[in-house]
Amino acid sequence: MAIATADLFDSHEDILESCETQFRSYGGRAAFHGPIRTVRCHQDNALLKSLLSTPGDGAVLVVDGGGSLRTALVGDLIAGLGVKNGWAGIVVHGAIRDSEAIGGLDIGLKALGSNPRKSTKTGAGEADRPVAFGGCTFTPGHWLYSDADGVVVAPRRLHD
């Protein structure tokens, strides 16, 4: 079910945060929503892969890659793990790769851009802590809604 971020903002402006970052949409789902999980990692995707290997239960993984476009944090295999394990979407404050293949996957995926260079895999980073970028704080357990107009965050679920 698509939920328009503009309509949500009109109805709940007092509690919503709107992310100012202009993401590109890469996944097969143009609109997605779910409870937030987070990972902070810089040019290393081992922790991100580990999280997407667990049941997502319709959650959205917000990845704070520090805005780096130097290496890709998500490729088609990692995005495929998200599909297999029931994640609704991934928002990457960084780069992805395998963009054409990701476009055929049933998952929402937004990122700053793409780069074919793979990341390191040491496991550096931290999970399930608040992360912030684009004037917005992404807190685990809060809700993220995304569509063609952008990304908004609410402290609770806003739809039936």
Swiss-Prot record:
Quaternary structure note: Homotrimer.
Query: Pfam families given for it?
Result: RraA-like
Q: Which cofactor does it need?
A: a divalent metal cation
Q: Which reaction does it catalyse?
A: 4-hydroxy-4-methyl-2-oxoglutarate = 2 pyruvate; oxaloacetate + H(+) = pyruvate + CO2
Q: Does the keyword Transferase apply?
A: no
**Cross-referenced Gene3D superfamilies:** Ribonuclease E inhibitor RraA/RraA-like (3.50.30.40)
Which keywords does this chain's UniProt record carry? Lyase, Metal-binding
- Write one Gene Ontology MF term: ribonuclease inhibitor activity
**Name this polypeptide is given:** Putative 4-hydroxy-4-methyl-2-oxoglutarate aldolase
Q: What does this protein do?
A: Catalyzes the aldol cleavage of 4-hydroxy-4-methyl-2-oxoglutarate (HMG) into 2 molecules of pyruvate. Also contains a secondary oxaloacetate (OAA) decarboxylase activity due to the common pyruvate enolate transition state formed following C-C bond cleavage in the retro-aldol and decarboxylation reactions.
Q: Where does a divalent metal cation bind?
A: D98
Q: How is the cofactor bound?
A: Divalent metal cation.
Task: Tell me its EC number(s), please.
Answer: 4.1.3.17, 4.1.1.112
Q: What positions belong to coiled-coil segments?
A: none
Q: What's this protein's family per the entry? A: Belongs to the class II aldolase/RraA-like family.
What InterPro entries does the entry give? RraA, RraA/RraA-like, RraA/RraA-like_sf
State any GO BP term from the record: regulation of RNA metabolic process
Q: Could you name the domain of life of the organism this protein comes from?
A: Bacteria
Listed binding positions for substrate are G75, D76, L77, I78, R97
Signal peptide feature range = none
